[in-house]
Amino acid sequence: MGSSNAVGKVAVFVDGANLYHSIKSYYKGVLDYGVLLAAAVGDRKLLRATFYIVEKQEADDSGATGGATGARSFVYNLNKFGYKVRSKPLVVHETFSPEGEKTVSHKGDWDIGIIVDMMRLADRADTYVLVSGDGDYVEAVEYLQSEKGLRVEVISATPCTSQALLDVCDAHTDLGDIPDLFRRSGPSRALGDHQSVVS
């Protein structure tokens, strides 16, 4: 993996929603988040690893929200692996046309929050590892490289990674190229727990 060749302090930023959709679309098996973090850090010193999630609030007929148990389990396991978890609720907007037809839209991403955290930590790290394929990070990556002297690496699913992000990052690793990242068998709840906190 290219990222393990660099030395110094490394900070890892995991865009949970982007990662979830990548797993769902392109890979089979249960992702081992401990292996993911170990691969991102390599032989370097971990400064911080942050996992960003969006919690889905699903209500049943009684109005009670579901998925809380899965979300707590998922966050607990991430903490055990060494991640700091930041979460926000999925915001649901309902609008009605003049004819009374309802349209439901969802908003819940961490792009701006992740970029802000990257800026805050820039003077303390040597390398950033971004686990996301989202092109919205390109300008932030360019700034961190040119103005802060940071090495920025990306781990993502290549088929759904922005070409601009691939072009600008210092190294890229496809999720499928990380040894033992996906278990063919194991607790079936793992992906379900991830599903309960991202959309």
Predicted features and spans:
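Terminal and domain-boundary accessory regions
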Residues: 1-199
